[in-house]
Every structure is written in structure tokens, then in C-alpha cells.
Swiss-Prot record:
Subcellular location(s) per record: Nucleus, Nucleolus
Name of this chain's protein: Pre-rRNA-processing protein TSR1 homolog
GO biological process: endonucleolytic cleavage of tricistronic rRNA transcript (SSU-rRNA, 5.8S rRNA, LSU-rRNA); maturation of SSU-rRNA from tricistronic rRNA transcript (SSU-rRNA, 5.8S rRNA, LSU-rRNA)
Residue spans of biased composition, Basic and acidic residues class: 317-340, 431-442
Function statement: Required during maturation of the 40S ribosomal subunit in the nucleolus.
PANTHER family: PRE-RRNA-PROCESSING PROTEIN TSR1 HOMOLOG, RIBOSOME BIOGENESIS PROTEIN
Amino acid sequence: MADHAFHRPGPLKQANKAHKTGRHRSKGAIDNAQKGKIGLRPISHKHKQQQRKEQRRNQMNQLRKNKREEVLEQKRKLGGQNTAPFLVCLLPMHEQIDPMSALEILKSCDSELVVENSPSGIVYINLPRFKQRFAFVTPPVGRGNELIALDYLKVCDTTLLLTTAAFGDDEIFDRWGQRIFNMMSAQGIPTPVVALMDLESINPKRRPAAKQAAQKVISKLLPEEKIMQLDTASEALNVMRRIGGQKKRILHNVANRPHLFGDVVEFKPGSDPSDDLGTLEVTGFLRGQSLNVNGLVHIPGLGDFQLSQVVAPPDPYKLDKSRDGENSEVRLLDRSDPSKRTSLQSENIPDPMDAEQTWPTEDEIAASQAETKKMKLVKRVPKGYSEYQAAWIPDVEEVEDPDGKDDDDMSEDDDDDKEDDNEDFMSCDNKSFEDEYEKRDSDTEEFQDTVSVASEAAINDEKYDQQMDFQEERETLKKLQQARTDQLWPDEIDTPLDVPARERFQKYRGLESFRTSPWDAKENLPADYARIYQFQNFDRTKRRILNEAKEFEGVLPGLYVTLYVINVPESRWNAFKSAQLMDNIIVYGMLPHEHQMCVMNVVLQRMPDSEVPLKSKEQLIIQCGYRRFVVNPIYSQHTNGDKHKFERYFRPYETVCATFYAPIQFPPAPVLAFKVNPDSTLALVARGRLLSCNPDRIVLKRVVLSGHPMRINRKSASIRYMFFYKEDVEYFKPVKLRTKCGRLGHIKESLGTHGHMKCYFDGQLRSYDTAFMYLYKRVFPKWTYEECLVRTAEHERQHASANRRSSQQVAMEE
């Protein structure tokens, strides 16, 4: 093989200088990064343990088994031999449907079925075929009974919605059905089952089309529900099987607390006849969580009470009657300790010597007025500014107050704050409104024209006018006009001519930035804040209390028990019995702190069919969780941040946050807002949820002062009509200005003595532009909480005196 010659470089080979990229990456490194190449990495000695295929399969089977056992455990807690029966609410969606006829069909579904009726009207059905038992309740139907139906639905396990095919495809739900369905949707529907009745009464050829039309209507409201037929015994058996076998929907607001639907109720007066107190014995099946006998219970319509003991009588509705000999005696489950009972005190009693923020005395006011007359070096700071907020305001020369008046003596409330508070209590019972509106109708009839009318059309017009409330029409029109004005020019008000602006807006202040400027949540608090309770961390407390309620070992749910509710006023109980349409009562076990007053914040959304704007501080009936009460809430924007802008009106299709004083309640809790109609019925105007119980939520009311450019010279302009006194211009000089076109500026100096001022902006002003000054003050709700309880004569006298004290306090504040 021939030898091959290879080139060998000599010592004089050219060596090019290496390219140095410096601090930036080279083109090659950038190219490698874009291609996704990864550099070399040291091998870690900690290898992750990779599961084999069999191990992964076993893990999935274990998780599936745990979930299945959890579901079965939830099912075993209801309807069995030693558990509470399925509580089913029969709710017609049409006023013409008789729920008792549907109940008779259900009673005939099986030959071995056992039916028993309780003294309060609950129908117990034991079905040995399924080894299950059921309890059926039927709330009253018709306009005015919505609240009773909502109370029943709060504690039921299943809702059996009854519809009919006898009135055609368009009458699956009538007006009553639509109204109650909207309310129960806002509150939360327990596991729904829809049954179609009277399908056998129509032509057999039209039955499939009628059922399909009904299914189409139901699918829009309840997409996951399939309509069932309820006309025969076999169909009733299918409905019972569906109720007992379907997965139950959990309403956490009720599931987090113990509750009892009263089966037998008995009131026993106390030993002292002059005391007017007695013991209320409520018997029924305990549901939800374990009951703490040392805690408080709430009965809607009666109030909050303490328990003395809990006993377990024999269960009269057992599935297997052959075991009646077992546990035939009354057993004492738990007895409360008087030293450990939760106190019924709902308000904090402030100590006047504990440095609480209270109204100053006359001596303090006189001393303050004498001090302000002295010559001193001051800063002109809007009232309410703290030291760190006023640090950027420049010092001014010495001034002397010629009048010697304190700014606090002047009223600062806007025109919309000078409205008269409605001192009349509006109860949730429709009968309480009849006297007021009958009197109004009688007054209206006195002014009716008594001249005989010949034509029939004129007679109809006269009848129509007699049924109309002209005062309510005028008030609604005025409210609509004010809401429209506030929507077009939000928060804009005219500077008064006769009162200096520095006195009119003495409690307002300017903010550098609404989002970032600080505002102390503890300054200038009202006296009512000394009466409430506050948590250091509400969310943390909520989690702790809910976890403790689940782990508490008290009276276990599912037992047939008797609660001894002590210190119930006999007069209130008699009034409650006379006002109730049904013999059932509901008892809720309250969590710790849920009877103490606080500032409650709820998120509300207007209902689609409610179009009249709601004014802030207008009276509403609020149902929050298991409570129902009357308050005058204030509204604010539902936004992130530590400050929230006050809303004068709650307009249709909007979402706001309502703030008011109410007892503490831990979320989740649905919220329903009702307004009283002129015919004394209730209309659902908003729905929402409980946000928090936090008094530190800062709600700022904004006023906008507007001025118009008189002369414009590039970035400077002369503004007029914002103020009418030279002193006002100097007082508000530190506050920034904003224009409608987005310019920012500030006041340079005053021009003349009539409020004209020279201002500088960050750009050229347009002749059609308008200068604005934003001022803010913190607003608080008024203490108008009134729980919806039955009223006795003594309570009416106490309420009247409380209203007089409240009106005197409001007059002093204004």
C-alpha cells in the first residue's frame, strides 16, 4: 500500500484571536437557547421513586374506594333505622295543584308501606322494600306565604317540585311558581326532584309532546334534572326510589350547624306566674352537626335562647317495630352547666372611662372654642386628617378665627343625607302592614270625585284611580329622577353661595390617590362602634370555629331528641302561635359568637325583574342564613383594595356591597333582600352572599366640586364657579384638580375675593373642559337593626320609646 502524505502545521501557523462577546450572550448562545437546548447538569444522586404500573393502579383503586365509602357514609346518615328520615318538602309550582293529592298517590305506592302522622302535620312513610323512611312536609301555598316556604326549604333534604300538564305547555309554572322558584334559587335549592302530574287526564296522543314541553321548561331552570311522572302507584314508587337513592346536594350554611324541624312542640309555664317565663320543649330529629347544650339556639320569629338539657325519647317512627322494646325509656343525653352557658348579651357595654370616642361635653366644647380664638401657627387641613396624611400640606401664616366658631357646629351632610329616617318598623308578617295601608286608602277615598259619571269608561277610570297610590307614584318618580341625575353626573354637587365651602365640607378631605393613599380605619369612629365586637382575623376565626364544630362530640345528629329551651316569654310564645299558619317550628344551633353584634358586609346583585333603584339607607328586609331582620344598609362598590366608594343608589343590573349592623354569622350564607310593596306583600329585589363581618371596611363618600375655565394660557387657566370665597381657595389649595379630559393640576393662587383662582395643569386645557375637585369622607351605617320577631303590647311600647330615642339622637347629630 502506498504511503500517504499528511500536512503537518509548522510553528508559524496563523492563530486567530478568539471572539469575546463581553457581557451579552453570543449569537450561538442565543440560537441554542431559542432551540431549547439545555446545558450540562450534574447528576443528582436523589432519584425520585417512580411507581410501577401496578402501584399506580393500586393507588387509583384506593382513592376510588375511599370516595365510594365517603358517598355511602353520607347516604347511610339519612333514611335508615337509626338515622333521621329523608325530610321532603312538597312544593307546588302552581297554585291550582293540591299537594295532598300528590301525597295520597305516594302513600299508595306499596302495599307494605306504613304511614304515620305527627301532631304537627308531618307525614312519616316507612318503606320496608327499600329499608328507608321518609318525612313529608307541605308549606302553605299562595301569595304572602313565600317566607314560610323558604324556612321549610332551609332544613329539608329534598324538594319535590310538583307541576301539572292540565293547563297546557305555557302554564308549567304560574306566577306563584315563578316567584317562589326565584326566591328558592337565591337561597339554595335542596336536592330537587320534579314530578309532572295530571298527564293521564289529557289525550294519549298528546302525552309525549306535553311531557317533552314540560321537560324543555324544566331544563332551562334545572339543566341536570329529568322530569318524572306522578299519576299512578308505580310512578310514585319510582319517585320514592329516586328520593332515597340520589346524591344529596349539601347546603353548607345549614350543614355546618345543628338544626331540628319541630315534630312535637309544648310550652310549659314557669313556677312563678309573675315571671312570664317558661320552658319550650321541642321534639324532633336532630340534623347537621353535633349540638352543644351549653350553646345558644335560634328560633325564627322568637329569638335566641339557652338550653337546659337534651333528652332522647323513644323513636315513634321506627322502621322495624319489632325492636320497640329496645331503648323504650327516656334517656338524658346532656345537661347544660349554668357556669358554662353562653351569655345572651349581644352588645358590648362601653366604659365611659375607657377612652372611648364619645361626643364631647359642653366644657370640652367651650375650651376648644376658646383655644381656637388664640393667635397660632396652623395648617389649614380638612377635618379628619391625621398627622401623616397632612404632612405634605404647606404651613401658612398666623390666622385668627373672627367668629370663634368650631367647624363641628356646621352641618356637613349632603342633601341626600337629610332624609327623614322611617321610624315605623316593618314586620315580615303581612298583617302588620294592613292598618297602615288601609288608613292610606281611606284617606285617598275622601278626595275621590263623587260626581256621577254616565259613561262606563269613566267609571272604570275612577275605580282604577281608587286602587292607585298617588303618593307612592310621586315618590317613585322622584327617586327615578334623582337616580338618573346621579348616574349622568355622579357625585357632583353645587358649591353653596351662602355657606363657605371650608365649613360646608369640613369633614371631607382630598386624597392624592384613591387607591394608594392611606386612611386610618380606627380614626373618628362613631359611638356605635363601642357596642360591637370585632375579630383580629375574621377568616382565621371562621376556619377554627367550623373545624371545631365538626370535631365537637356533643348530641349526635340523627337522634330523636327533645330540646328544653328555657326562659321563653309566655306572651311572645302566645303571639307567635296566633300568628303562625303552621304548627311547626325550626330550631338552629348557633356557633360561638353568632349572637354578638358586628358590622356585616354582604354582596348583593339586583334581580332581573326589579327595576326601581334602591336608595342608600332605605329600609330593607334582609334574610342572611337562618336570620331575618330589618336594616337600612349603605351601599359601596364591590372592588379590591382597602377603600371602597360609597354608592348613593343601588341601580338595576348592578352588584354592590351592602353594609349594616347585624349579629355575626360565618359564611357561607345566602342573602336575600326584600322590599315591601304598597299592597303589603314582599318583593325580592336582590340576592347575594355574606362577604365578611369586618368593621374596618372603609366606605368613602365622594363629592365632586366643578369649576369652569375662564381664561386659558397654555398650561395655566383661570377657574371660576368652584368656590365663591378667597378663603376657600386657600383652604383647598393642597388638593389636586382633575379635568374631564384627563388633565391633572393644582391651585396656584387666588384671584380676587370672589373665588376665582389660577391653576396649573400638566397639559393644554380645552375651552370645553371642566375642572373637578374630589373630596372624600368616611360614612358609617346607622344602627337600625330590628329582628323579625312577633310583637306583643310590651314590645310595641319598648319599640316606640326606642324610636323616640333614636330620632332624638339623629336630631342631635344633624
